[in-house]
Amino acid sequence: MYFFIFLKKGQHYLKSWPLESKLGMIFPENRVIKATLFAQKFMPFLAVFAITWQQVYAKSDISALAIAVFSAIVALLIPLQGLYWLGKRSITPLSPQSAVWFYEICERLKQVNETLPILTEQPNYQNLADVLKKAQRKLDKAFWQEL
């Protein structure tokens, strides 16, 4: 049950994290998101290709079929691993240094009259992603150069 919740949270986190090059130097999310998006597009093709290739070149070999099916299953699980990691990451509380940075961005957004949700607990990475997405839309490019 929790596995599917983490996958859903991971998909939401994937969509809400801004893919800015400056953030890629600080957080691993950019690399994980790009790898997950790549895996979502191409791993189903690889899974079908593995089984088709086996059927064309080794029809009567049962062990080759088992290896091809196993390869297909592994290929299909790779995007799920990325989504699971993103889901776990989204609920992880921010480190103290990142929390300070989070509150600084919130203050800048308040200066441009952007409404922010009220946090009753320590901010997590999903909150950071939401704030960064708003900053991407509302703040100028100079903000990203200051990072």
Curated annotation (Swiss-Prot):
Which residue ranges run through the membrane? 32-52, 65-85
* Main location group: membrane
Q: Where in the cell is it found?
A: Cell inner membrane
Q: Which organism is it from?
A: Pasteurella multocida (strain Pm70)
What is the topology of this protein in the membrane according to its UniProt annotation? Multi-pass membrane protein
What Pfam family does this protein match (any one)?
A: DUF412
Family to which the UniProt record says this protein belongs: Belongs to the UPF0208 family.
Q: Which residues form each disulfide bond in the chain?
A: none
What's the protein called, per UniProt?
A: UPF0208 membrane protein PM0703
Query: Keyword set for this entry?
Result: Cell inner membrane, Cell membrane, Membrane, Transmembrane, Transmembrane helix
Q: Which GO terms describe its cellular component?
A: plasma membrane
